[in-house]
Amino acid sequence: MKLDLKILDARMRDYLPKYATTGSAGLDLRACLDAPVTLKPGDTALVPTGLAIHLADPGYAALILPRSGLGHKHGIVLGNLVGLIDSDYQGELMISTWNRGQTEFVLNPFERLAQLVIVPVVQATFNIVGDFAQSDRGAGGFGSTGRH
């Protein structure tokens, strides 16, 4: 799949999104910063990537997801948990960054901060019904299938 990518900050030509390995699902996104940013515990920051994409096809969307190592080792996750990029969005990709850890974290310019995953999308329509056909689960919700 070929994506249209717009470079909004010329410095990002040297840091284009790429897969770290042949089996990677996510393309690494980097922080397009002029200087380091210090995130104290509980702080949030909206970090630019210097890039924009246009998927164009409504059968696809992109997800911005955290990098597992940053979350596990440093408590750096996404403030919005998952960033959803719609197929018709053409603006800059921004990374909502949250330090949920216990110590300060310094985010350096061009550091890998998140990952971009392209996913298929089905746009549903609704069929209004009075009742559903019976299922084994029914309306059983949280914890209804047991613990083990």
Swiss-Prot record:
Pfam families in alphabetical order: dUTPase (PF00692)
NCBIfam families, alphabetized = dut, PRK00601.1
Q: In which pathway does it act?
A: Pyrimidine metabolism; dUMP biosynthesis; dUMP from dCTP (dUTP route): step 2/2
Question: Which keywords fit this entry according to its UniProt record?
Answer: Hydrolase, Magnesium, Metal-binding, Nucleotide metabolism
Name of the protein this chain belongs to: Deoxyuridine 5'-triphosphate nucleotidohydrolase
Query: What's the source species for this entry?
Result: Burkholderia thailandensis (strain ATCC 700388 / DSM 13276 / CCUG 48851 / CIP 106301 / E264)
What is this protein's function? This enzyme is involved in nucleotide metabolism: it produces dUMP, the immediate precursor of thymidine nucleotides and it decreases the intracellular concentration of dUTP so that uracil cannot be incorporated into DNA.
Q: What is its EC number?
A: 3.6.1.23
- What top-tier enzyme class does this entry carry? hydrolase
Binding positions for substrate? Answer: 67-69, 80, 84-86, 94
Question: To which protein family does this belong?
Answer: Belongs to the dUTPase family.
**What cofactors does the UniProt entry give for this protein?**
Mg(2+)
BP terms from Gene Ontology:
dUMP biosynthetic process; dUTP catabolic process
What Gene Ontology molecular function terms does this protein carry? Answer: dUTP diphosphatase activity; magnesium ion binding
Q: Which reaction does it catalyse?
A: dUTP + H2O = dUMP + diphosphate + H(+)
